[in-house]
C-alpha cells in the first residue's frame, strides 16, 4: 500500500496534468477548478488544499513549463541561424519523444497569447522573458543585422506563434517538408 506522501504526490501529478490540459484547451478564464477536478477524478477542494487556488496552480504550471522550455535552449552557442534551426529541431524531438508534449505546448501558447493571464503571472513571465534564449537570439541577430528590426518581445511572440503552428502541422502530418529552414526565414532580414 502506497504511503501517504506517495498518494499525495500521485494526486498532485494527476491534478497538474489535468490542469495543463484544461488551461491549454480552455484558457485561464474559462477553466474552472471543477473542470480540472473532473478531469483529474477528484474534488475541487483537493485542488485548493494541495495548490491553494486556480491562480496559484496556473502560476506554478506557467513558470514550470516556461523554465523547461528555456532549459532546452540554454546551451545554444551557434550563430542565430543555427540556433533557430536547433530550437525547431529540439521542440520537434520533444514532441516525438513525449506523448503529452503537445499538451504542454498548447498550454504555453495559451499562456503567452491570452489576454486573461493574471498580472502577477505575467510579471514573473516577463522577468523570465528577459533571460529568454529566444529573446537573446533575436536581439543578437538584430545587432548582427541578420534579423528584422522590431521590438524583440513582439518578435519573440511571433517566433513562438509561428513555431507552434509549424510544429502542429508536423505533429498532425500536414506538412510534407522539414520546417527548420523555412521557419528561420520568418525572422531573417531580406
PLM feature segments, named:
Residues 1-10:
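N-terminal intrinsically disordered/low-complexity leader segments
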Residues 70, 117-144, 153, 157:
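Amphipathic alpha-helical packing segments from all-alpha helical-bundle domains
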Residues 60, 74-101, 154-159:
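Hydrophobic alpha-helical connector segments
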Residues 63-69:
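Short, basic, alpha-helical segments at the C-terminal edge of helix-turn-helix-like DNA-binding modules
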Residues 2, 85-93, 131-143, 160-190:
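C-terminal peripheral helix-coil segments that are non-catalytic and often amphipathic
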Residues 10, 14, 18, 22-56, ...:
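Helix-turn-helix
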Amino acid at each position: 500500500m502506497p504511503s501517504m506522501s506517495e498518494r499525495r504526490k500521485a494526486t498532485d501529478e494527476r491534478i497538474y496534468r489535468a490542469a495543463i490540459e484544461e488551461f491549454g484547451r480552455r484558457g485561464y478564464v474559462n477553466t474552472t477548478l471543477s473542470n480540472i477536478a473532473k478531469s483529474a477524478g477528484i474534488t475541487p477542494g483537493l485542488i485548493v488544499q494541495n495548490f491553494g487556488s486556480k491562480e496559484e496552480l496556473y502560476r506554478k504550471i506557467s513558470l514550470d513549463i516556461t523554465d523547461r522550455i528555456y532549459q532546452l535552449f540554454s546551451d545554444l552557442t551557434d550563430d542565430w541561424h543555427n540556433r533557430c534551426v536547433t530550437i525547431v529541431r529540439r521542440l520537434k524531438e520533444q514532441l516525438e519523444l513525449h506523448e503529452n508534449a503537445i499538451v504542454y505546448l498548447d498550454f504555453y501558447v495559451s499562456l503567452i497569447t491570452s489576454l486573461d493571464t493574471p498580472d502577477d503571472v505575467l510579471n514573473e513571465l516577463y522577468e523570465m522573458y528577459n533571460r529568454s534564449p529566444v529573446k537573446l537570439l533575436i536581439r543578437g541577430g538584430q545587432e548582427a543585422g541578420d534579423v528584422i528590426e522590431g521590438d524583440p518581445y513582439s518578435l519573440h511572440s511571433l517566433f513562438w506563434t509561428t513555431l507552434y503552428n509549424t510544429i502542429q502541422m508536423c505533429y498532425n502530418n500536414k506538412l510534407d517538408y522539414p520546417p527548420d529552414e523555412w521557419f528561420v526565414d520568418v525572422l531573417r532580414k531580406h
